[in-house]
Amino acid sequence: MTSATQFDNVSVVKRANVYFDGKCVSHTVLFPDGTRKTLGVILPCALNFGTDAPELMEVQAGKCRVKLDGSDTWQTYGAGESISVPGKSRFDIEVIETLDYVCSYL
C-alpha cells in the first residue's frame, strides 16, 4: 500500500488547504480504508496551530522548532523525524527552513 517515498491507490482532493496567508499549504490524501493524511509545505515563519484529532507530523525536508501546548521547551525537528501532537490542543512552530511534511490524523 505505501512505501517510504509514495502512497499508492489513493485519492487526492484537488482544492488546496491554504492557511496563514499562504504560509502553509497542503493537500488532503484519502486512503481506501477511510483514513486521511495531508501533504504540505510551510514557509519560514512562526505560527500557532490548533488540533482536533491527535496528529503525527513526519518531516520530509526542512527544519523547524516546535513547542507543544503546556510546555516551555522548544524541540528541533528535521528530515526523517516526527512530531506527535495531542488532540484538542495547540502548538507553536517556528519554521527555520521550508518544511515539507506529511500529517497523519490518528
Curated annotation (Swiss-Prot):
- Which keywords fit this entry according to its UniProt record? Glycosyltransferase, Transferase
State the top-level EC class.
transferase
Q: Which domain of life is it from?
A: Bacteria
Q: What reaction(s) does this enzyme catalyze?
A: a purine D-ribonucleoside + phosphate = a purine nucleobase + alpha-D-ribose 1-phosphate; adenosine + phosphate = alpha-D-ribose 1-phosphate + adenine; cytidine + phosphate = cytosine + alpha-D-ribose 1-phosphate; guanosine + phosphate = alpha-D-ribose 1-phosphate + guanine
Q: State its Enzyme Commission number(s).
A: 2.4.2.1, 2.4.2.2
- What are this entry's molecular-function GO terms? guanosine phosphorylase activity; purine-nucleoside phosphorylase activity; thymidine phosphorylase activity; uridine phosphorylase activity
Q: Which Gene3D superfamilies match?
A: Jelly Rolls (2.60.120.10)
Q: Which CDD domains match?
A: cupin_PpnP-like (cd20296)
Q: What's the short name of a Pfam family annotated to this entry? A: Ppnp
A Gene Ontology term for the protein's cellular component? cytosol
**Membrane-crossing residue ranges in chain numbering:** none
In the record, the note on similarity to other proteins reads: Belongs to the nucleoside phosphorylase PpnP family.
| Family annotation (HAMAP family) | Nucleos_phosphorylase_PpnP
**Functional note:** Catalyzes the phosphorolysis of diverse nucleosides, yielding D-ribose 1-phosphate and the respective free bases. Can use uridine, adenosine, guanosine, cytidine, thymidine, inosine and xanthosine as substrates. Also catalyzes the reverse reactions.
Protein name in UniProt: Pyrimidine/purine nucleoside phosphorylase
Give the originating organism.
Burkholderia multivorans (strain ATCC 17616 / 249)
